[in-house]
C-alpha cells in the first residue's frame, strides 16, 4: 500500500482535484491525451483538455500516451524528487505511445509543481517520501 495515500478514494479525490485545476488553467495548451494506470492503490485516470475521467468513466477513450506507475512514484515526480527521464530509465514509470509528445508537455507543467505542494498541504499529505 502507498506510503502517501492510505486508501484509493483519497488518492482519486486528490488527483481529480489537482488535474482539474491544471486543465482549467492550461486548457487547450494540453493537446495530448494521457492514461495513467496507477498502482498501490489501483485506479486509472484519463486526462485530456476536456477534463479527467477516472476508472469506469473512461469507457473506450484512447490515449496518446499511457503511463503505468505507483501512486508514490507519481507523488515523488510532482515533488521534484524524481525526474521523468530517471523514472523511465529505472522502469519506475512505463510508457506506451509517443515519448517526444510527453517531453513537449513537461515545460507546460512547470507551474504545476508548486501547485502540487499546495494540494499536499490542503489534503494533509507529506511533502517528502
Placement of each model-derived feature along the sequence:
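Feature captures hydrophobic
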Residues: 1-129
Amino acid at each position: 500500500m502507498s506510503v502517501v495515500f492510505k486508501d484509493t478514494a483519497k488518492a482519486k479525490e486528490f488527483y481529480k482535484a489537482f488535474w482539474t485545476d491544471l486543465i482549467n488553467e492550461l486548457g487547450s495548451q494540453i493537446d495530448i491525451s494521457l492514461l495513467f494506470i496507477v498502482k498501490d492503490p489501483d485506479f486509472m485516470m484519463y486526462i485530456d483538455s476536456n477534463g479527467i475521467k477516472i476508472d469506469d468513466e473512461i469507457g473506450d477513450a484512447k490515449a496518446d500516451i499511457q503511463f503505468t506507475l505507483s501512486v508514490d512514484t507519481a507523488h515523488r515526480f510532482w515533488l521534484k524528487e524524481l525526474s521523468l527521464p530517471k523514472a523511465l530509465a529505472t522502469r519506475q514509470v512505463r510508457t506506451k505511445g509517443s515519448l517526444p509528445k510527453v517531453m513537449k508537455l513537461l515545460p507546460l507543467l512547470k507551474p504545476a509543481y508548486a501547485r502540487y505542494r499546495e494540494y499536499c498541504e490542503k489534503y494533509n499529505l507529506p511533502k517528502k517520501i
